[in-house]
């Protein structure tokens, strides 16, 4: 538009006297964008872009005009005063992150109408006036993350119809005002993660028809109601990781195009049976590290488009209600973490869910959960309230509110006696199989040795034969020695003659009388 006016001005001046032409021509040239003045000391200039970074500046440089971009990152700015950037009417982006800014006046960005990108992250801002962004209607991206914002002014984002990206991560925000984003019709990315949100109002996100990604992770939310996200028809990704959510419900029956949902790291114990019927296009779901004990068959039926799911780290009850989940996992063609462990009952603690179903014959009187039979083994719950216990009593032949996929049936769950018998049988079978396996290994080793090392086996056999022969020789010698000793004592006959014995020496002779021997009883 400026160039069109300039052309008309020149055309009109060419038809006037020369003096008038020169005067008016000078006035017209003042309408042109001013060239940037000299580059401030220690700053870096690249054409009409100025970078004054990490210089410990406490104020913005003065006498700057004609700039298209200004970066004052990593300095020591503490306050943004009214009219501080008045001369930068051509500015399109402004970086003020990593300073010590704690106060922003309402008219600090006056006359910065052309700014499209504003970064105020990593400062100490505690509040922003309602009129902070009013002078910048062309904003596309605003970064307020890593500050100390505790509350948001109700009209803070009023008039920002071109805003597409908004970062408010890692503040201390406790509440999102109703319809605060009403004018942000072009917003596609919104991050309010790592704050202190305890609840959400029903119309907090009203007007965000083009929003595709919403981050609410690491807050203090205790309940998720899908009615809090009305008419977010373009939303594809919702992150609610690491909150304190215990219940997931949906009080509005409407369909949205959500494809990815992260609910991991919460305290979820109950989900309404129809809660996922409002997201028929859901492809990725994270439910790991919660307190789920079972999943309703109606919920499993609504997971028709899933290609990825995580369920580990929950308190799975491997009892009456595990059959539907086991069958669904058997038939699931996508990716899942595969580390689902039983938390109860006691005899199944620590076992993999699918292994427990097979080992303890939990479903259909011991039948294995295959080919979708298990999904019809559990009756759909008719009530929508939280379960009184993880093992809900099923009525024989009763009819619940269901969508026609599951048929009512009874599930045989082993009692205490049957469970103990099953455990004992399982141990006996396991021990027998281990023994047979060990025997087969020994036979295999002998067979391989006989085939591969025949000479060694012959030597080993000769050693055994020689050793046995030596043992026999020793036994024979011992027997012969014992027999000779017995014959010596049995055949002994004394040759002495009863009477006097005369011993003669050089001094004379002695006479002694030998008495016959007597046997004494001992």
Swiss-Prot record:
Does the UniProt entry include the keyword Transcription?
no
- Give the bilayer topology: Single-pass type I membrane protein
What are the BP-aspect GO terms? establishment of localization in cell; exploration behavior; locomotory behavior; long-term synaptic potentiation; negative regulation of receptor internalization; positive regulation of synapse assembly; protein localization to synapse; receptor internalization
Q: Which GO terms describe its cellular component?
A: axon; endoplasmic reticulum; extracellular matrix; extracellular space; GABA-ergic synapse; growth cone; postsynaptic specialization membrane
Domain of life (superkingdom): Eukaryota
Signal peptide from the UniProt entry? 1-34
Q: Where are the LRR repeats?
A: 64-87, 89-111, 112-135, 137-159, 161-183, 184-207, 209-231, 233-255, 256-278, 279-302
> Per the UniProt annotation, where are the glycans attached?
56, 63, 130, 380
Transmembrane feature ranges: 428-448
Cellular localization per UniProt: Cell membrane; Postsynaptic cell membrane
Keywords, in A-Z order = Cell membrane, Glycoprotein, Leucine-rich repeat, Membrane, Postsynaptic cell membrane, Repeat, Signal, Synapse, Transmembrane, Transmembrane helix
Q: Which residues lie on this side of the membrane: Cytoplasmic?
A: 449-522
The answer, when asked if Zinc-finger is one of the entry's keywords, is no
Q: Which residues form the LRRNT domain?
A: 35-63
Outline the extent of the LRRCT domain.
Answer: 314-365
Which portions of the sequence form the region Disordered? Answer: 382-401
Q: Which residues lie on this side of the membrane: Extracellular?
A: 35-427
Query: What tissue expression does the UniProt record report for this protein?
Result: Predominantly expressed in forebrain regions including thalamus and cerebral cortex.
PANTHER family on file: LEUCINE RICH REPEAT FAMILY PROTEIN, LEUCINE RICH REPEAT TRANSMEMBRANE NEURONAL 1
Q: Which family does it belong to?
A: Belongs to the LRRTM family.
Any remaining note in the record? This gene is imprinted, being predominantly expressed from the paternal allele and showing a variable pattern of maternal down-regulation. May be associated paternally with handedness and schizophrenia.
Write out the function statement from the record. Answer: Exhibits strong synaptogenic activity, restricted to excitatory presynaptic differentiation, acting at both pre- and postsynaptic level.
- Could you identify this protein by its name? Leucine-rich repeat transmembrane neuronal protein 1
- Species per Swiss-Prot/TrEMBL record: Homo sapiens
């Amino acid at each position: 538009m400026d160039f069109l006016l300039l052309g008309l001005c020149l055309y009109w001046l060419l038809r006037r006297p020369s003096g008038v032409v020169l005067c008016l021509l000078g006035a017209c040239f003042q309408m042109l964008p001013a060239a940037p003045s000299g580059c401030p000391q220690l700053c870096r200039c690249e054409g009409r872009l100025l970078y004054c970074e990490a210089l410990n500046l406490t104020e913005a440089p003065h006498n700057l005009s004609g700039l298209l971009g200004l970066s004052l990152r990593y300095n020591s700015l503490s306050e943004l005063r009214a009219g501080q950037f008045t001369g930068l009417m051509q500015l399109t982006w402004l970086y003020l992150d990593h300073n010590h800014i704690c106060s922003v006046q309402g008219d600090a960005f006056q006359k910065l109408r052309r700014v499209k990108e504003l970064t105020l992250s990593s400062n100490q801002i505690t509040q922003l006036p309602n009129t902070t962004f009013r002078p910048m209607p062309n904003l596309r991206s605003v970064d307020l993350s890593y500050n100390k914002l505790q509350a948001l002014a109700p009209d803070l984002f009023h008039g920002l119809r071109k805003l597409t990206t908004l970062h408010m991560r890692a503040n201390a925000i406790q509440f999102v005002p109703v319809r605060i984003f009403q004018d942000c019709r072009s917003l596609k990315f919104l991050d309010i993660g790592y704050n202190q949100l305890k609840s959400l109002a029903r119309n907090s996100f009203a007007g965000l028809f083009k929003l595709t990604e919403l981050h609410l992770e690491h807050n203090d939310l205790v309940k998720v109601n899908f009615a809090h996200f009305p008419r977010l028809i373009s939303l594809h990704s919702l992150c609610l990781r690491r909150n304190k959510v215990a219940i997931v419900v949906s009080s509005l029956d409407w369909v949205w195009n959500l494809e990815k949902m992260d609910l991991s790291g919460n305290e979820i114990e109950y989900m309404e049976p129809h809660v996922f019927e409002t997201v028929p296009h859901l492809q990725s779901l994270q439910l790991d590290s919660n307190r789920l004990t079972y999943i309703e068959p109606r919920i499993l039926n609504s997971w028709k488009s899933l290609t990825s799911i995580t369920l580990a780290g929950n308190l799975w009850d491997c009892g009456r209600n595990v059959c539907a989940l086991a069958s669904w996992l058997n038939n699931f063609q996508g990716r899942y973490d595969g580390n689902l462990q039983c938390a109860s009952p006691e005899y199944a603690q620590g076992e993999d869910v699918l292994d427990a179903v097979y080992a303890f014959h939990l479903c259909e009187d011991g039948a294995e959960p295959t080919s979708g039979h298990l999904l019809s083994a559990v009756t759909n719950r008719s009530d929508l309230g939280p379960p009184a216990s993880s093992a809900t009593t099923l009525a024989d032949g009763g009819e619940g509110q269901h969508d026609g996929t599951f048929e009512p049936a009874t599930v045989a769950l082993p009692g205490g006696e049957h469970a103990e018998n099953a455990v004992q049988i399982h141990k006996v079978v396991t021990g027998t199989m281990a023994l047979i396996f060990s025997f087969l290994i020994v036979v295999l080793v002998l067979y391989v040795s006989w085939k591969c090392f025949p000479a060694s086996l012959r030597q080993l056999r000769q050693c055994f034969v020689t050793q046995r022969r030596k043992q026999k020789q020793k036994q024979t010698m011992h027997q012969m020695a014992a027999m000779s000793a017995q014959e010596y004592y049995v055949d002994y006959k004394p040759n002495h003659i009863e009477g006097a014995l005369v011993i003669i020496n050089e001094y004379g002779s002695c006479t002694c009388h030998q008495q016959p021997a007597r046997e004494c009883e001992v």
